[in-house]
Amino acid sequence: DNFIESVSAERLGKVVAKKIERLEKSSGRFSAINTLDDVFKIAGQTGDFEIAETYGVDEAMAGVLDRTSQLAIAAGIDAIRDAGLPLVERFRETKTGRKLANGWALPESVGRETGVIFASAFPGVDRLIDEVSRSSRVEALREVMGELEASGDTQLATQLKERLKGTNLESDYSFSRKFLFRILSMGHTQMAQHLGALGPNTQLNAACASGSQAISIATDWINAGRCKRVLVISADDVTYRQNLEWIGSGF
């Protein structure tokens, strides 16, 4: 399956709206990006991807994970399959003593010898941008509504309320109690929990060298006898939702 799509003109327009200045290599001068012709040409974006449906990750866990962690965990599951490591069905015991199926994991003997390293430059960024953007939009609307009501223009205020009906902006913003879990870099811990990997576990950020550094550390762990194998999961998605107009613009 192909999970890569082309970037729409609408999304590229948001990059233009950032009023970026770029360096012209031929003249050595800075010039403003004002049209779609001035933004990057070679670019793609990730398509639809549902980690719970495609990879069997618990839906509650998937709802907390940021996009980068979802991609990293999916890559980790694929790596386990490619390596031919066995997975056994897990069970949890209820209060009545019954055992219920609880997903698949590495055999305990294999899991104890398996470490996990999560390498990423922008973990949690999409969740952070989304939360701040929603809060800012609702706050801006509150100010506009307040000014309209104070001016006595009840007709325009009523029209605005009608247009907002059925949208996410209709109700007041409420801070998510899961905010910290969503923005923290937790791909390594969730991967270990999902697969039952009980060896050494960490995450790192070395920008574009994150994956290479992770493999180097994994080699050191194995040579030092800390584990027999290390699952290195590395991912970033700068094209996801609002990431592109911020991180993409930075590039």
Regions found by a protein language model. Name each.
Residues 62-63, 86-91, 100-105, 123-251:
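Acyl-thioester C-C bond-transforming condensing/cleaving domain
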Residues 19-43, 99-102, 117-118, 128, ...:
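Nucleic-acid-interacting cores, centered on viral/eukaryotic replication and modification enzymes
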Residues 1, 115-120:
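Mixed-charge, low-complexity intrinsically disordered regions
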Residues 67-78, 180-183, 210:
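Phosphate/oxyanion-binding active-site loops and adjacent basic polyanion-contact surfaces
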Residues 46, 116-118, 191, 251:
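Generic structural hydrophobic/aromatic packing signal, biased to beta-strands
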Residues 1-61, 69, 83, 134-141:
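ACP-dependent fatty acid/polyketide chain-elongation machinery
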Residues 69-109, 115:
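Feature captures the FAD/FMN-dependent oxidoreductase FAD-binding
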